[in-house]
Amino acid sequence: MPEWTEKPGLLFVVATLLPILSFGLLFVAAALRWGLRPYAKENNGVNGIFQLLGGEVTGRGPAYVALAGISLAFVCSLVGFVWFLTEVHEMHDLEHELIHARVVHPDKHEKPEESKSNSQVRYNILRDNWRGSFEWARIYSTQAKDIERGAILNLGFRIDMLTAVMFMMVTLVATLIHLFSIGYMSDELQEIVEDHEVHTDKGHLQRRGRYGRFFMFLSLFSFSMLNLILTDNLFQIFVSWELVGICSYLLIGFYFERTSASNAANKAFIVNRVGDAGFIIGLLIIWTYFGTFNFQEIFTRIRCPEVDYHGEIKIDKKNAAHQFIRGNITPETGRSYSAITLDKGGDTALIFPRVTKGHWDGPSSRTVASNEPSATEYSYIPYWLLVAAGLGIFMGCVGKSAQFPLQVWLPDAMEGPTPVSALIHAATMVAAGVYLVGRCYPLFTPEVLLTIAYVGAITLFVAATVAVVMTDIKKVLAYSTVSQLGYMMLSLGVGGWTAGLLHLLTHAFFKALLFLGSGSVIYGCHHQQDMLKMGGLYPKMKITAITMLIGVLAIAGIPLFSGWYSKDEILAGAFGFAMKNQQHFLLFLLPLVTAGITTFYMFRMWFMTFTGKPRDHHVYEHSQESPWTMTVPLIVLAVFSVCVAWPMPDSTGWPLLDAEKSWLGHELHHYNQPEAVNVDFKSALASAQDNHTIVGLLALGVVGIGLAFASLLYYYGVLDPNEAKEQFPGVHRFLTCKWYFDELYSALIVRPGIIIAHWCRSFDANVIDGFVHLLARWNLFTSRWSGRFDKGIVDGFANLLADVSYGIGNWLRNVQTGYLRSYILFLALAAVGIWVLLYAWAAALGGG
C-alpha cells in the first residue's frame, strides 16, 4: 500500500468525498427527524433534539451544509489544479526524455532494474504523486498459466490534465448552482407547500416542504460525477455512472406528485437503461479478453507500444506505434497456440503482453499468440468483438448524453427544478457520456469512431431544428443541450479530441448560465415558463437579461466568447476530415448549417423574453429581478462564459482572435490528447489546420445569417413568424412534434409492449391460472373422494376390526366370573380338549 499521505493527488480524492459527507450528514439528520417526529410533542427532551435537527421547518441549514461541502471541494480542486500544473510540465518533459533515450540508446535499457537513471526515478515519483489504487476484489481467471489474469476490481484515482480541468469545472459550476438554489428553492422552506400543478378533490395538493431533501440529493449528484471523473478504471466509472442515473431520477421526479414529473423521471431512467445494456456488453467483452478494467492497461495492450528492444516498433518498414495491429489466425492443431499473420484487414486484433522483460521484440509478420496467455505472451481478440466492445460503451454514452436515437428523455427532464436542469445539462449527467468517449478514445476502432461522428451529426441537426419552434424557455435550452452534445460527439468521431472536450468545458459554463438565467426569469415571473407570455422584461430584470445575452453570444460562437474557440475548432476538424474523406462531407455540412440555426433559436429566445412589448400584462406587472443569491452566480458564470478559453499573452502580444491558441485547448492537446488521435487522423488534422481561417469565416457568415433572421422576425418585426407557420404548416407541425420520435417509439415499442403485456396478463389469467385452478379443483375433487374412501372404507374396516375385538373381549369377560368352581371346570375342559388333540395327532402320525 503506497504512502497516501505524500500524494498531492489526494486533494482530488478529498474534493470527491466532501459532497458525500454533506449527503451523509443531511441523510442522518433527516432520518433522526423522521424517527423523533412522533415523540417530539410528548417529550420535552426529544423535542429539544428534534428542534436542534431542524424541526418541522428545517430552514436553510441543509443548504449551507451542502454549499459548504461543494465549496470546499472547489477549493481543494483549485489547489490541486495549481499544484498539478507545477508538476505536469516537468513530468511531460521527463517522459519524452526517457522515450528518446530508449529510441537512441536502446542497449542502455537491457536491464532497467539495474540502470535506472535519475530521470526515471524522478518521473516515477511525479507520476505516482497523481495516482493511487487498491485492489477491492479479484475474480481469478480459469487460465492457470496466468494466475494474475482475472477481473481486477480496483478503487483508485489517476489525475491528468483532463481530470484536473473537469474537476475545476464541475466543482465551480456545482457551487454556483448550490448558491443559486438557496434562493430558487425558497418555496420549499414552508412547512406546508401548496402545489398548484396538482389538483385533488379538496383543491390544490398540499405537502411538506422538501428543502433539505433537495440539497441532500444535489450533494449526492455532485459526488457521483466527481467520482466518475476521478477514477482510473471502468468498473468504478460504471458504479458512478449508475449513481448519476439514480440521482437524476430522484431530482427529475422531485415533484413526484405531478404526473408529468413522475413520467419524465421514469422515461429518463428507462431510456438510460437501454444504453446501459450496451455498456454492460462492452464491459463483459473487455473483462473477458483483457482481464482488467484499468484504462491504461487496456490501452497499452490493444494499441502497439512505442518502442521495443530495437528502440522502435516497425511493421513493413513503417512505424506501428499506437496503432491496432490486425491479422488472420492460423490455428495450430492440438496446441494451445495460434499463428497470426499480420494483415491490415485481418479479422483479429493483437493483444500485447501485459509484462515485457529483457530483449522484448515487437510483433513480426507471423506472430505466435496463446489461446491461454501468460503475462508475457501475446493474445488476440476477434476484431468484430473489439468493434462490439467500443459500440457497447458508446451505446451507454448515447443514453447518458441524450444522443440519437435515445435523445427523447432529456427535454422531458425539464420537469425537475431548474437548478437540477442546470446541473444535469452543464456539469454532470449529460457531460458524463462525452467525457467517457474522450477517456476511452484509444479503445475505439475506425468503425466505431465513424459511428460516433454520424450519431453526433444527426443529433446536432435534429435537436437544433426542434429548438426553433419551442416556446417553453427551458425546452429551448434542453434541445440546445442535445444539439451541443452532438457537436462534441461529432468532433470526437472525426479526430477532434481536443476540440470536443474543450467544447464540453466551455459549454458547461454558458449552458449553466443560460439555465440559471431561465430559472431567474421563471422565478421572477412566478414560475411562468411560456415565452409567449413574456416579452419586455429587460427593464425589470437587467442583470438576468445581460448575463443571459452573454450566454447566447457564447453558444452562438461569436468571436472573443468562449464558445467561439471550441466551436471553430470543431468545424475546422470536421472540414479537415471531410476533405480527406469526401464521401462523408455531410459531417461538415450539418454542423455548419446548424451553427446558423443555433444562433437563430438562441437569439429568438432572448428577444421573445426580454424585448418588445409585454404579451401578458399580468406576468409583466408581477415580474421582478431575482435576489443576490441568484444573480451573483449569473455574473460569475457570465465572466467564465467570456474568458475561460482565452489564449494566454505571449511574446507577440495577446492573440485573442486566434481560436487555435486557446490556453485551455493547448493544455488539453499538449498534455492529454491520446497519441492514437495523431496516428488515426494525421492527414485530416493537417488539413483542418491549413483551412482553419476559411472555415472560421464560413462559420461567421452562417452565424450572421442566423442572427439577421432572428432580428428581423423577433426584434424588428419586419417578418411575421406566424406567416411562416401558415405557409409551412406541415414543417411546423413536424418540428413541434419533435420529428415524431415519441410517437414512433410509442407505435413501435411502447404500445406493442403494452399489448404484449396485456396479452401475457390475459394468458396468465386465462391459461396458466386457468390450468392451475383446474388442477386445484381436481385436487379438491380427489381430496373429497379420498376423504370419503378413507372415512368409509379404510376407517370403516379399522373400526370393524375394533368392534369385533371389542365384542370378543366383552364375551371373554364373561369367563372371568371370580368363582373357583368355574375355573376348575374350565381347566378340566381344557385338559380334555388338549388330550383329544394329542390323541388325534398321534393317531394321524401312526396311520401315516
Q: Across the structure, where does each feature detected by a protein language model lie?
A:
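Generic start-of-chain signal for non-secretory N-termini
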Residues: M1-L25, R33, K116, W835, ...
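Aromatic-capped, Gly/Pro-kinked transmembrane alpha-helices
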Residues: E90, P112-M161, D650-G701, L712-G848
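Hydrophobic transmembrane alpha-helices and their helix-loop junctions in integral membrane proteins
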Residues: T175-I237, I246-E625, W646
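Hydrophobic alpha-helical membrane-insertion segments
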Residues: A68-V88, G275-F290, M548-P559, P633-E660, ...
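Membrane-entry segments of alpha-helical transmembrane domains in multi-pass membrane proteins
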Residues: P2-L21, V57-A68, A151-V170, R210-F217, ...
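Transmembrane helix-loop-helix hairpins at membrane boundaries of multipass inner-membrane proteins
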Residues: M1-E6, L10, A31-G212, M216, ...
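Membrane-interface interhelical loops and short amphipathic "cap" helices
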Residues: M1-L11, L53-G54, L85-L98, E114, ...
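Alpha-helical transmembrane segments and their helix-start/interface "positive-inside/aromatic belt" motifs
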Residues: L10-T16, V57-A73, N266-F279, P539-L549, ...
